[in-house]
A protein has these predicted regions:
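Short, polar/acidic, helix-capping and beta-turn segments at strand->helix junctions
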Residues: 1-154
Length: 154
């Protein structure tokens, strides 16, 4: 299978689209209904390793949180590719939903989630601009620093 134009952009950026991570609970990692594809929350996994754990603002730096969100986004894109066959099938990114395991007094969740948002705009241009929420959370599954879900239109 030839590389899609979106995957070519990823490669040019030095980013690698991983294999889609397995679900860590009783749910499906990606679902298509009509012209919408949505992912379940993706964690900052590289292979089977959770690479950023703990609270952003104490155990994890703000910039590492940003990188964690980018990894979550790459995992979400891997799920979407698994569902569609190609990331070029995405017409528009609709929504990014993000949770940041935050230390008390950490209020820069928006910067952390920019790790996902900026990647999507770099890949899809205007069609990558999306609605978003960035929520501070006390705890996340497996002690992950960040969790991201994405909705796209196809």
């Amino acid at each position: 299978m030839s590389q899609s134009s979106i995957e070519a952009i990823l490669a040019k950026r030095g980013d690698i689209l991983p294999s889609p991570p397995a679900a860590v609970g009783f749910y499906v990692p990606v679902l298509r209904t009509g012209n919408l594809v949505m992912t379940s929350g993706q964690l900052p996994m590289l292979g089977k390793e959770l690479v950023f754990t703990g609270k952003v603002g104490s155990e994890v730096t703000r910039d590492d949180g940003y990188n964690a969100a980018k990894i979550c986004c790459l995992n979400a894109l891997a799920q979407i590719k698994h569902c569609l066959g190609s990331l070029d099938e995405v017409r528009r990114v609709i929504r990014v939903e993000g949770f940041v395991q935050s230390a008390a007094g950490f209020h820069d969740q928006a910067h952390v989630l920019n790790g996902a948002s900026e990647l999507l705009v770099d890949l899809y241009g205007e069609a990558g601009k999306h609605t978003r929420f960035a929520v501070g959370a006390n705890e996340l599954p497996l002690n992950a620093a960040v969790e991201v879900a994405i909705w796209v239109e196809v």
